[in-house]
């Protein structure tokens, strides 16, 4: 069985790590480099760096910050925010990223996924899908959760897989920052219907939530921010907890 991954996420705005609730009310969560070093030493499996306002402000991710982070860590780095072309993806890779995450740009130009995958391989392309429950459906949102799209979550997940995505980062906007646990219903629905890895995101508030994301949501990886940024739990602690409950993790 493949080991389940624990992935801290650095939501970056104006050169600092921030964290909000339901994509709103951002508060400072520390220095980018300090947090990156901490997670590297904490046995995180990967690190995600998301410039959360790049697409909203129609600008590019700051490459200097990516370069600094990549130079400080020895774990895979995924970078997202404002990546809207193959050339921009190339620049991010040249500055040390192992994977790129696309969201808004992929909805606007779905074949961007294919073009990046053809150049760098599917394993280097993560499609971030931000979803919100609307009636009985889960709709996909872009621009840091500001703009609804016409896509239903499961439909879009299948489409990005067909286009060449190597992984899906599924974030529940309803659960984001609430510490109420992942939305395991939609997580399980998508995880069991695609053949690429799905990363659970949005809502982790304790170690049991991570366990539930793997067992109830069938996620391949669990992304979290608040519980790690503010030192409520450590990644080492999380992995030991999961190991004791029968989840295969890298220690």
UniProtKB/Swiss-Prot annotation:
CDD domains: HisF (cd04731)
Origin: domain of life: Bacteria
Gene3D superfamilies, sorted: Aldolase class I
Enzyme class: lyase
Signal peptide: none
Keyword RNA-binding: no
Pathway it works in: Amino-acid biosynthesis; L-histidine biosynthesis; L-histidine from 5-phospho-alpha-D-ribose 1-diphosphate: step 5/9
InterPro entries tied to this protein: Aldolase_TIM, His_biosynth, HisF, IGPS_HisA/HisF, RibuloseP-bd_barrel
Keyword presence, Transmembrane: no
Compartment(s) where it occurs, according to its Swiss-Prot or TrEMBL record: Cytoplasm
SUPFAM superfamilies attached to this UniProt entry: Ribulose-phoshate binding barrel
Subunit structure: Heterodimer of HisH and HisF.
Function statement: IGPS catalyzes the conversion of PRFAR and glutamine to IGP, AICAR and glutamate. The HisF subunit catalyzes the cyclization activity that produces IGP and AICAR from PRFAR using the ammonia provided by the HisH subunit.
Protein name, per record: Imidazole glycerol phosphate synthase subunit HisF
Protein's gene: hisF
